[in-house]
């Protein structure tokens, strides 16, 4: 990497967020991606070039900067987190039949299911490669949370059309599917700053709870927002019988 300065000349928090988002986008565009086979790498490039919010890598940067983490290691972790997030979105969109992601056709919609499976696998592999020279605990926690996300998706599918699901079960599911990655984002920034285990756990819990709030809000917007504003397909939760906070509140009235 060239000289990496992730602290802009501004006292505005919102300007700092935009600066980090731009730096993350630039770094994503520089990830080495082969041109062949196009069947694999064209959809991967398509996903990486998408205009996501970069919420998770930004959180990792903020956590790391607060704890004086090395900026090079922090950028690698942030990119790996964003690739893991996009891997999960590519597969989730296919499983749920969602046709729009980040304002453009989802991978399985633009190509097909087989392409989406392979592209997701490739994104996950690229994420792993970014972590190879970082401390072993970073690699371990990354993969522990990756498995937790898969568990959350498994619970999400199991809960479809099951009217016995409680709000506590729902909260457990979204803590795995959504909260865990935000928890990891906050935690890994702390770990790169060589903080103690108690602080690392607190950072994970902070991110986890942020993720729960984010998912509950997303459940609301899934029903009451507009697809153009959200940049993704909406209403599929109702069609598929997904268990959301609003749906469960209605069931348990």
Identify the role of each PLM range.
Residues 2-29:
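N-terminal amphipathic/basic leader segments beginning at the initiator methionine
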Residues 19, 29, 33-251:
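Mg2+-dependent prenyl diphosphate-binding active-site environment of isoprenoid biosynthetic enzymes
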């Amino acid at each position: 990497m060239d000289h990496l300065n992730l602290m802009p000349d501004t006292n505005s928090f919102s300007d700092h967020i935009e600066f980090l988002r731009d730096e993350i986008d630039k770094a994503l565009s520089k990830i080495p991606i082969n041109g062949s086979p196009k069947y694999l790498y064209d959809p991967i490039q398509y996903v990486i070039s998408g205009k996501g919010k970069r919420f998770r890598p930004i959180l990792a940067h903020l956590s790391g900067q607060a704890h004086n983490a090395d900026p090079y290691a922090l950028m690698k972790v942030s990119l790996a987190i964003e690739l893991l997030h996009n891997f999960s979105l590519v597969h989730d969109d296919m499983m749920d039949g969602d046709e729009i992601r980040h304002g453009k056709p989802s991978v399985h919609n633009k190509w097909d299911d087989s392409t989406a499976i392979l592209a997701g696998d490739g994104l996950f592999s690229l994420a792993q490669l970014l972590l190879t020279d970082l401390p072993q605990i970073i690699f371990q926690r990354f993969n522990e949370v990756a498995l937790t996300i898969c568990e959350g998706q498994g619970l999400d599918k199991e809960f479809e059309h099951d009217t016995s699901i409680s709000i506590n079960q729902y909260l457990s599911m979204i803590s795995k599917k959504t909260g865990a990655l935000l928890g990891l984002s906050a935690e890994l920034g702390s770990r790169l700053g060589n903080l103690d285990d108690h602080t690392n756990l607190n950072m994970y819990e902070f991110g986890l709870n942020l993720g729960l709030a984010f998912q509950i809000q997303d459940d609301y917007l899934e029903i009451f927002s507009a697809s153009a504003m959200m940049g993704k397909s909406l209403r599929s939760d109702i069609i598929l019988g997904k268990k959301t906070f609003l749906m469960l509140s209605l069931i348990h009235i």
